[in-house]
Amino acid sequence: MASDSSFPGASSNVAEYSVSEISGALKRTVEDTFGHVRVRGEISGYRGPHSSGHAYFALKDDRARLEAVIWRGSMSRLRFRPEEGMEVIATGKLTTYPGSSKYQIVIEQMEPAGAGALMALLEERKQRLAAEGLFDPALKQLLPFMPRVIGVVTSPTGAVIRDIIHRISDRYPLRVIVWPVRVQGDTCGPEVATAVNGFNTLPDDGPIPRPDVLIVARGGGSLEDLWGFNDEIVVRAVAASHIPVISAVGHETDWTLIDLAADMRAPTPTGAAEMAVPVKADLQASLASQSARLSSAMSRFFDQKRQAHRAAARAMPSADQLLALPRRRFDEAASRLTRALFVNTQKKRVHFDGHARQLSPRLLQRRLVELERGVTMLGQRLPRALEAFLRERRTAFTHRANRLSPEPILRRTRLTGSTLEQLDRRRDQAVRLLIERVKRRSQELDRLMRTLSYESVLERGFAVVFDAQGKPVKQAAAVSPGDALSIRFRDGDVGVVARAGLTIPDPTKGQ
């Protein structure tokens, strides 16, 4: 059996290590040799901090890959937020992980690998978000002219918030609500986005008033310092805000993606305050100027209208001139109406007098007597006429009875008897109706006669003058002085003698 010395190297002086020993030796060698290194590479596999606060990813270049870890304490001290694909310079120490024969870098500090790398990443993000329409000018909102509440997203300490509040107080004092955030570091972007979204979710009638305009502000700094305002979640929050947003990040020469998404960009935080509120003194001066101009314009307007009114009044005829022709027509119509009424009254009086002369009492009495006589004669003649008619019919019936059978004769006799009875009843009814009509007519004529007779005039308080022959005196010219006259009143006659020169006043003229 061959001895162990037959194997190659069995008698060499190479030290023998266990797996743990060699792993520990490697760990000490790596940590001692590379205790503090700076590594440049591209971040790969970055998913943000773990729930523990640590971050695990890798640094790579074209030919190699190095695992990396940032503990929670170091993560909170970073001045920017790491992102996938960002080229960085990491400072830390190398260590191995014996359990899996892997080595990694424990990063203590990390910074972007120059402005060029950040600008390239920034340009790529800008193009991608612009393609989504987040920077579309059509989405921009107008700033309110007179906001009631202004919301400010910035650090609660520092000169920025003091400058904003001081500038607003100088221009137009109003309520300012500050949402405190970190304006640098890994948590800057999420906190700013949370603040913008939080202001938008405030109800209009809640205990905290909803701002009318937002100011997102930060002082100047390097690209790395301002990198949190290039965060995609910040850009999306500002673009989706229903409240107008003014971006005031950095100095006038600085720019971030939030400037493109905001509704207005201010060169400085102080400039943002000036954009948000007007100057109260300027408003008062403008209001006074506008008021003076309005008063002057109204004064000129009323002066012009007053002059135009006076000119129109001078050109128009006076009221007397306007009413002269209608007044003349009215007077002529009134005169014609008076004459027409007088003439019509005279015609009616003449017509009435003519009918009154025809309706003398004796004539009416004679007419009534004639009507009564006619009715009496008709009443006397009607029975005799009926008896004669019946005799004639009876003779004819008797003559025909000799030639006809009894039955038809009996039927016709009964029918004729019924007809005669009806005629007899109708005769009596006709006589009664005729007598009633004559009576009504006589009564009407009697009432008319009484109305037209001079006795009715006497009943109303008038008197009738008769001459010596007993004729009515119709005109004063028919009476001579010394004539004997008789005045008939309602209750009797009085004899008088006419005298000359006596004038009795007209009672109607004294009314």
UniProtKB/Swiss-Prot annotation:
GO terms for biological process: DNA catabolic process. Keywords: Cytoplasm, Exonuclease, Hydrolase, Nuclease. The keyword Cytoplasm applies. Pfam families: Exonuc_VII_L, tRNA_anti_2. It is an enzyme of class 3 (hydrolase). Transmembrane segments: none annotated. This is Exodeoxyribonuclease 7 large subunit. It comes from Brucella melitensis biotype 2 (strain ATCC 23457).
